[in-house]
Regions:
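Polysaccharide-binding and catalytic clefts of secreted carbohydrate-active enzymes
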Residues: 35-39, 43-241
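Short, solvent-exposed turn/loop segments enriched in Gly/Ser/Thr/Pro and often Arg
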Residues: 1, 24-33, 88-97, 194-198, ...
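A general structural detector for well-ordered alpha-helical segments in enzyme core domains, enriched
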Residues: 3-10, 73, 77, 177, ...
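Residue-level signal for threonine
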Residues: 3, 31, 103-107, 320-323
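A structural alpha-helix within SAM-dependent methyltransferase catalytic domains
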Residues: 8-15, 78, 82, 247, ...
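Carbohydrate-binding surfaces of carbohydrate-active enzymes
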Residues: 141-144, 217-220, 226-335
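Aromatic-lined substrate-binding rim segments of carbohydrate-active enzymes
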Residues: 1-45, 177-184
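Loop/turn elements at helix/coil->beta-strand transitions in domains of secreted/extracellular proteins
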Residues: 15-20, 83-88, 186-189, 250-252, ...
Length: 335
């Protein structure tokens, strides 16, 4: 059953105050009934630990069951909101990363990936992986397992192909979501909010997206060798590098999450120095960024991120120090 009245109420409230809405697909936080009814969707780490409900991002992009149910939900969302003028765009998932899943379904998908890449020719794979060394020759794709990176001197060609496979799973999942939405949303853009983990190789790999966005947290308990103010300002290169990385992909890009104050997840969670939030915002625009969103508007009253600051405090009305820095930059940028 798909129930929209609660979400309709939130969209209507935003519209009442002339706010445009970016709708997010909730694939990073599957409900508990899904994990219990279909435990095969859960990610299995290399050490055998199976992720479970109670956090987030525990469902595998390589799971056919999870994809099928996720796509059904997304299509219903798109049918409901695709022609809604209050919705300006969509964010897919949340901070989608490359998953290194050791679930049996992921292993089967990895073999299919290799069959396609090497045109069902096991000799071609053996030649590419150099398996003649150390008697690693395979006679069938069915003999290949996911690489055990904890095992010393694992074949690095195999690891590289596995990382490419894992990146392709993330890219395909996002691309399919985007195509589903665009069937119904002709005047709404679609993006996602990547964490700039450049080495994972998946950023920009979903061509259906209209543009790319990134998430950036600057102050989280590491001064990164930039002086005594580093704990409260952050390293400006973190924004500058992200700007230079994202800008060439499609030209248009932005920041979907920029902290307005302390976070909850760092080793130390200091308040940004006065003026730091404003500095970060202008750094994004100076580097060519087209928009900035914040995470979050109101500090939550409960949950894992209870101590994550917002533009306003827990009472929902008192503007925080960082929140006050959003206002002048927003007005100046609009002019």
């Amino acid at each position: 059953k798909y129930d929209f009245p609660w979400l309709d109420k939130a969209v209507a409230l935003a519209a009442k105050y002339d706010l445009k809405v970016i709708m997010c697909t909730s694939t990073a936080t599957p409900p508990v009934w899904l994990s219990r009814k279909y435990p095969e969707i859960l990610i299995k780490n290399e050490n055998g630990t199976v992720l479970d409900h109670g956090a987030r991002q525990h469902a595998s992009f390589a799971s056919p069951v999870y994809r099928e149910l996720a796509y059904k939900m997304i299509e219903k969302l798109a049918q409901h909101y695709g022609n809604d003028s209050r919705i300006i765009g969509w964010q897919l998932d949340n901070e989608p990363a490359v998953q290194f899943d050791y679930n049996p379904k992921a292993e089967l998908a990895f073999r299919d990936f290799l069959r396609e890449k090497y045109h069902h020719d096991i000799k071609a794979l053996n030649d590419a992986w150099g398996t003649a060394f150390w008697s690693e020759v395979y006679s069938s794709f069915d003999e290949i397992t996911l690489p055990k990176t904890a095992q010393m001197f694992m074949n690095h060609h195999q690891i590289l192909d596995y990382r490419r496979f894992a990146a392709s799973q993330t890219n395909d999942f996002l691309n399919e979501q985007c195509l589903l939405i665009k069937k119904y949303a002709k005047n709404q853009w679609v993006t996602t909010n990547y964490i700039p983990n450049y080495e994972e190789g998946h950023i920009g790999g979903s061509p259906a997206l209209d543009f790319q966005s990134y998430t950036r947290y600057m102050v989280y308990g590491d001064n990164e060798g930039i002086g005594r103010r580093g704990y409260r300002v952050g390293n400006p290169l973190r924004i500058a590098f992200a700007n230079d990385f994202f800008r060439p992909i499609q030209g248009t890009y932005g920041v979907m999450e920029l902290q307005p104050g302390q976070v909850n997840w760092g080793s130390i969670n200091p308040q940004p120095l006065p003026g730091a939030v404003r500095l970060w915002m202008w750094s994004v625009f100076a580097g060519g960024g087209d928009f900035i969103c914040t995470y979050r508007y109101r500090q939550p009253l409960y949950g894992t991120e209870q101590y994550h600051y917002g533009i306003v405090g827990t009472d929902g009305t008192t503007v925080t120090p960082g929140g006050r820095e959003y206002e002048p930059v927003s007005y100046t940028h609009l002019r």
